Amino acid sequence: MRLGFIGLGAVVETAYLPALRQIFDTPLHCVGFDLRPERELPGVVRSPSLEQLLASPIDTLFVTTSSLHHLDALELALSSTIPRIVVEKPVVATLSQIERLKTLLAKPEAAARVLALDHWMARSGAMQLALGILNPAWQPEWENQTAGRVVNSLDEIVKIEGFLQEPSGFNAAGEPVALNFATGEPDTRQLRHPDGVIIDIGTHVLAMMRETVRALGGNHALSLQVITATDRLGRPIATGDLLTAEGEAHLQGHVSGIPVDIWLNKYAGPAGGQKGLRLHLCDGRIISHDRCGTEDVLELIDGENVQRWTLPGAIYAHCLAEHILGEKSLYERAPGEVAFTTQRRLEEVELLLKLQQQLRGPH
């Protein structure tokens, strides 16, 4: 298996390469290119130019540049013969880029090659528990712990909450600072718009939520509004502010007609907070899918009675193994779904970008 990367930044170093080492026993053939000549990663052979990378015999190409350059890289990649092109989230970064991307994907032969990736779309535990098809990889808290089908129809779900509340640290002035999601070290980047929580991490929650609802029989209907949005110091984002990144936001709306609340926070304190979904059922029970340390945690909550399962491993490793690479990949098991999956990710990014316009004003 031959893999290529356009962009050799932090997400490749801290997420992709560790995940590939976890999945495969033997090293893969990886090649890559980055505009910054000093960027070299162990295990990735650097190509002298992007043209040479795209001419290489690559099975799957990952577009892992900064989000503003995803579309330019994708356009060049589509001119190559590489059969599978996976674009990191968000698939594009501006509303004007969305129109260009839609034009590219209007060609069926191009749409069949391009998969817009959000690794949270692999977090399907809540759906599995709801349908009574929990993967044996989920480890029960108690021996002989079982749960049959929990949800028989979509109208049994009365509300969904989505969360991504990341742990944070403090700088010398006592102000909150973001932490790298993979290493836990302080994030030295100066986060600016559009890299606030609405686009940067809202994409994760929305992808997980929509894939779950879709698998339970939902449709593509989607609407959201911004209830609150503040910077890392808790100050409201002002109309006309095109510089300050949102540090925290509350979004509210409907997915397939179900009321939803999405809680996003990049500065949730040293312990962080919830990272996943809570499905509230009409009989009072709750299906909770969370993340704790290096494990996903699934719970069926019925008052004081809680059944719990855990799934160890990095989310990226599960996503690459179950959706992107090998015989289980979406390209292999359901090639017709590749374009539809990309369309859903594009719809989500477009809506979130429009929320930014409403929050800050046209830009």
Label each residue range with its predicted role.
Residues 42-107, 123-133:
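Beta-loop-alpha module in the N-terminal Rossmann-like domain of NAD(P)-dependent dehydrogenases
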